[in-house]
């Protein structure tokens, strides 16, 4: 079975948030249901305000019916206090899908797929992510998504 959905890329920290919300509203009216965004550039000196703004963005996305995937990496995990065994900081933000730009090794990648929050973990299908090995060794296949690069 294949899952198809239309999506948009949105970068709320790089654009006027009012324009971003208008774009999201238009896309929702046209039947788009997925947003891809980047969650890689969290300024350390403005972390709290950035996370508050991102949470507002997530709330608006969900209000409009979007599922949101955010590109992130192990460095961001550390910055917001998340670990492969603890995705609560991402759950608190309302993230639906974490697209891993990098990995935590086999055991860490297995752990991240077994999170209790229902957050899907998206691996890059353009690279050999070794997903078959993850599943064979206990990764939760119901929380694994594969997606090719958007460019």
Predicted feature descriptions by range:
Residues 9-13, 40-42, 71-77, 101-105, ...:
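Active-site beta-loop-alpha junctions enriched in small/polar residues
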Residues 47-73, 109-126:
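Alpha-helix-loop-beta-strand connector modules within alpha/beta enzyme cores
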Residues 36, 92, 98-99, 145-147:
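Conserved beta-strand positions in the central sheet of alpha/beta enzyme cores
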Residues 2-6, 31-33, 60-68, 94-96, ...:
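Short, well-ordered coil/turn segments that N-cap beta-strands
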Residues 15-28, 78-89, 127-135:
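Short, acidic/polar
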Residues 29, 33-56:
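Glycine-rich, proline-tolerant flexible connector loops at the mouths of alpha/beta enzymes
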Residues 2-22, 69-82, 122-124:
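Active-site mouth loops of central-metabolism enzymes
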Residues 104-107, 111-151:
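Catalytic alpha/beta core domains of metabolic enzymes, predominantly
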């Amino acid at each position: 079975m294949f899952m198809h959905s239309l999506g948009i890329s949105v970068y709320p920290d790089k654009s006027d948030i009012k324009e971003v919300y208008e774009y999201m509203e238009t896309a929702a009216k046209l039947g788009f249901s997925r947003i891809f965004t980047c969650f890689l550039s969290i300024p350390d000196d403005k972390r709290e305000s950035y996370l508050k703004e991102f949470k507002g963005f997530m709330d608006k996305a969900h209000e409009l019916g979007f599922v949101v995937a955010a590109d992130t990496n192990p460095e961001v995990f550390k910055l917001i206090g998340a670990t492969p065994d603890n995705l609560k900081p991402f759950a608190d933000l309302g993230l639906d899908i974490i697209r891993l730009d990098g990995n935590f090794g086999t055991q860490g990648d297995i752990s991240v797929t077994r999170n209790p929050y229902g957050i899907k973990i998206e691996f890059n299908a353009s690279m050999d992510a070794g997903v078959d090995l993850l599943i064979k060794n206990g990764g939760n296949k119901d929380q694994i998504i594969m997606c090719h690069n958007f460019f």
